[in-house]
Design a protein with these regions (language model features):
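Sequence-level detector for tyrosine residue identity
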Residues: 3-6, 28, 38, 52-54, ...
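Hydrophobic, Leu/Ile/Phe/Ala-enriched alpha-helical segments that form helix-helix packing faces
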Residues: 34-35, 80-83, 172, 176
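Activity-critical C-terminal alpha-helical subdomain
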Residues: 66-145
């Protein structure tokens, strides 16, 4: 599957008091808007290499870290060790924010559904450095000229409309934002 949640043993829903994203692009802007609706704080670590130190500095808060599974890599181990030892931490790793949007079904596009089933059949690793870049290119291409026109740097307000927003949040099983 293209997302993972830690601690993976968790049977209860994760109810964070705060969300931390790794960067300040569209994904952060999306979760920041969601957090505001629920009177929660959303912070950005301004880069995956800062996630660990942020968590060390905020040790008493219930934090959900949302980071791109595709790009998290080596930083992951240190953060995972923290998550294993602290009950107030959870880690949600979708492949990327763009993957989350694509898999939400809001685009109702059969080609996207096929690609999400077996992405490795479609991704040319010579052309795309990472899955994240591929999914970003796909989302950008599929939404160009539509009301959901996507750019990585700035979130289109259309993604915060109830139907769209709820479809995206609906992908995040076990995460409860109240």
């Amino acid at each position: 599957s293209f997302y993972r949640i830690y601690p993976d043993s968790t049977t209860e829903n994760i109810k964070p008091e705060k969300i931390l994203t790794e960067d300040s692009n569209s994904g952060y802007q999306f979760f920041d808007a969601i957090c505001k609706e629920h009177q929660m704080q959303c912070d950005t670590a301004n880069g995956k290499s800062n996630v660990f130190s942020y968590l060390k500095a905020h040790r008493n808060e219930k934090i959900l870290v949302i980071a791109d599974g595709a790009a998290f890599g080596p930083e992951m181990d240190r953060v995972l060790q923290l998550v294993q030892t602290r009950e107030n931490l959870a880690l949600y790793l979708p492949e990327s924010f763009e993957w989350l949007v694509l898999s939400s079904g809001i685009l109702k596009d059969t080609e996207i559904a096929q690609i999400l089933q077996t992405p490795s059949d479609y991704i040319d690793s010579k052309e795309y450095f990472s899955w994240e870049r591929y999914f970003t290119a796909l989302l950008t291409e599929k939404t160009a000229g539509t009301y959901l026109n996507y750019t990585k740097k700035t979130l289109n307000e259309a993604y915060l409309r109830d139907g769209v927003k709820n479809a995206i949040l609906g992908q995040m099983q076990k995460v409860e934002l109240k």
